[in-house]
C-alpha cells in the first residue's frame, strides 16, 4: 500500500517498479543491440544519461538489496546483497562495466554458488546477470527473480 498527498510521486514509484520488473523479466530474451526500455526525463537534454534502479525487499524471510544502473544501450552496473541473521550485508555478485577496457568486471561473494563464469560469459551488454543466470537454471537466485 502506498500513501501520500496528491502530486507526491506515488504514480512515479509504481511506474519505476513496473519498469524494473519489465527489465528483470525480459532482458535475458533481448537480442544483441536491442534497446533497453528506459524513457529519459522528458524535460532533460541528456537522452542517454544513466538511470538507477534499486530495491530492498524481504522474500522468504530473507532481506535482499538488488539494483542496477543502465542507459538505453547497456547495463552499466548490477549488484545483489543478502542480509543474513546478523543483518550484515553479504555480496552475492557485483558487475561493473569498465569503459576503458570495454568489458565487465565481476566479483562474487563466497556464499554465491554455481556456474558463475558460465552465467557471466552468457550475459550480454543489454541483459541483467540475474535474468541470464535464471534462464540458465540458477536456483539460488530464484527467490530474487520471483519477487518481480
Q: What label would you give each PLM region?
A:
Residues 65-148:
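Electropositive, glycine-dotted interaction segments
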Residues 1, 5, 11-66, 71-75:
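Conserved P-loop NTP-binding catalytic core
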Amino acid at each position: 500500500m502506498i500513501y501520500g498527498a496528491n502530486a507526491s510521486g506515488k504514480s512515479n514509484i509504481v511506474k519505476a517498479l513496473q519498469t524494473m520488473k519489465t527489465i528483470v523479466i525480459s532482458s535475458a530474451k533481448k537480442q544483441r543491440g536491442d534497446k533497453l526500455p528506459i524513457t529519459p526525463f522528458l524535460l532533460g537534454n541528456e537522452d542517454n544519461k544513466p538511470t538507477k534502479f534499486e530495491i530492498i525487499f524481504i522474500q522468504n524471510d530473507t532481506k535482499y538489496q538488488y539494483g542496477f544502473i543502465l542507459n538505453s544501450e547497456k547495463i552499466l552496473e548490477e549488484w545483489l546483497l543478502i542480509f543474513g541473521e546478523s543483518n550484515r550485508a553479504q555480496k552475492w555478485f557485483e558487475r561493473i562495466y569498465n569503459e576503458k577496457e570495454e568489458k565487465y568486471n565481476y566479483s562474487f561473494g563466497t556464499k554465491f554458488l554455481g556456474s558463475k563464469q558460465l552465467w557471466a560469459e552468457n550475459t550480454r551488454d543489454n541483459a541483467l546477470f540475474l535474468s541470464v543466470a535464471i534462464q540458465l537454471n540458477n536456483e539460488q537466485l530464484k527467490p530474487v527473480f520471483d519477487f518481480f
